[in-house]
Amino acid sequence: MAPLCLRDCKAWQDAGLTLSTTSNEVCKLFDATLTQYATWKNDCTLGGIDGCLSRIKDTDPNFVMGHVAANGLELIGTGRSPRVDKELANAVRVMSDLSKSQALTEREMLHVAAVETFANGNLPKAADLWERILQNHPTDLLALKFAHDCYFYLGEQRQMRDSVARVLPYWKPGTPLSSYVKGMYSFGLLETNFYDQALKVAKEALAVDQTDSWSVHTVAHVHEMRADLDSGLAFMQETENNWKGSDMLACHVYWHWALYFIEKGDYEAALTLYDNHIAPQCFASGTMLDVVDNSSMLYRLQLEGVNVGDRWKNLLQITKSHTQDHMLIFNDLHFLMSSLGSKDEDMTRELVESMQELSKSPGENQQHGLINHLGTPLCRALIEYDRGHYDKAADLMYPIRYQILGIGGSDAQRDLFNQVLIRAAINSSSKYHQNLARCLLTERDMGRPNSPLTQRLIKKCSAGPGILG
């Protein structure tokens, strides 16, 4: 990244995004932070995002937007909970106090309010506040990215798409990072099933910058949702050198690559990608995206009857420290997969009991408000499935299958729960569940024709119960 490309105080003001600091260095470091966030790539020449934020704080400790970016990125990463992490909670308080001690723009005050609101767990209101910023400042990348990620956690697919659609015309080709905004739009199109348009927009973004890993990610998703394995595998292999340097997303793109192999039934190839890329990057970063990818990959392989050895216990070294976080139900379910896979009954019990305790007084925390009708039934379903109580697992999951969207994540990520439900129904001794399995598989085959995984499940369903792990 060339320092000359980074905006100083006047450039931010000219863009209609005035920053309350007199330091040109701080303004450029803030721009560098946003650039790395948008491109999913830490620039080592700048010290990465953490290095930029640290230098901002050292240069102008009263620069509120520096605190907004630092706290917002921690919170949006969902790897730390201000409810249990006192250092993070204090950092949010410091930001709030600073915002009251100086004259800020309305836009900056809304940013502070949005981060405070997200910290309190009120994700829908936080998204609304970021949208208020975008109504008057459509090129505010921090507000756009935070809203985009927030909608992703909420399972609000249309909002995730439309939030970008409303501002995209304001991002001219000469606007810094405009092609990456187009990549964000491609993902929203994908998640609302506009696959052809998603591919078109993603490829337009990649024509500008072939290292745009988020647009690569969109293309990977489209091939996954269409079960177009040959195209997906070819695309991954042909573009790997372009995106593998995106240290914040490469693990997830490798996860998508491994999904193609699981779909094909080539489990050794999937395990090789796991051992060579997915696991090492997770242990290096510890980020939640990488953690849930690891849990999901091992669980999917286990569903296919693959012995994953000690890999669960290795992953537990990371997940166990997050048992009390309860930032997202989506995360909690993946922590649970790791405790079940490791046969750690104490962690399973602690995770579920602490979740249920929070459901008693959720307050404004949107995720805690979902525990009783989504979090607890899904946790119980995974536990019952693990115990071989397939009928109970199916009965817990089937009534809420269309509500599972509310835990967030992508269609590809949540498909794991579809697979668990189908396998539970197949393996149940109940004729009702076996018939349900046939119905669900017919539905799946219609939606994703030519899926080898679906065909394997159809054959197992025809063979009768008792043949799944």
From Swiss-Prot:
Xref: CDD domains: StaR_like (cd05804)
InterPro entries of this UniProt entry?
Answer: TPR-like_helical_dom_sf, TTC38
Give the signal peptide, or none: none
**Swiss-Prot/TrEMBL TPR repeat ranges:** 107-140, 179-212, 251-284
Q: Which UniProt keywords apply?
A: Repeat, TPR repeat
Family the UniProt entry places it in: Belongs to the TTC38 family.
Q: State the PANTHER family in the record.
A: TETRATRICOPEPTIDE REPEAT PROTEIN 38
Q: What protein name applies here?
A: Tetratricopeptide repeat protein 38
Per the UniProt entry, what species is this protein from, by scientific name?
Xenopus tropicalis (Western clawed frog)
At the highest ranks, the source species' classification is: Eukaryota, Metazoa, Chordata, Craniata, Vertebrata
Q: What gene name is given for the protein in this entry?
A: ttc38
